[in-house]
Regions:
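Phosphate/dinucleotide-binding and metal-coordinating scaffold of catalytic cores
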Residues: 1-104
Length: 104
């Protein structure tokens, strides 16, 4: 299972987990987090969100076109491994969101 911490404005907001190798994902806010939501579709009032596909908000942060091709080649990531793609670019995302891999 892959996991990543998600930060908003450099404050840890929660954890994104891949539960079933590309088939199930979970985002969970930290219990004490009271900042801005990661996405308007995932308000802080609910602490756990589960998805059967890669969460749309995070999917929208991924590179496309030539940038995606370059990332896949450079990092040797499978085109369908969206979680690994997010981890590879997580320090340089558009906006105030940062994603960092949780090392086991």
């Amino acid at each position: 299972m892959k996991k990543a911490n998600v930060y908003i404005n450099e404050i840890e907001a929660g954890t994104l987990s891949e539960l079933d190798l590309g088939k199930k994902y979970r985002f969970e806010y930290k219990g004490n987090y009271r900042g801005n939501p990661v996405s308007l579709t995932m308000p802080v009032s609910q602490s756990v969100y589960e998805f059967n596909l890669f969460p749309p908000f995070f999917d929208g942060l991924l590179p496309e076109g030539y940038q995606l091709d370059g990332l896949l080649k450079f990092a040797k990531i499978d085109r369908n491994d969206l979680f690994s793609q997010l981890l590879a670019v997580g320090d340089d995302l558009v906006g105030n969101v940062t994603v960092k891999k949780i090392e086991r």
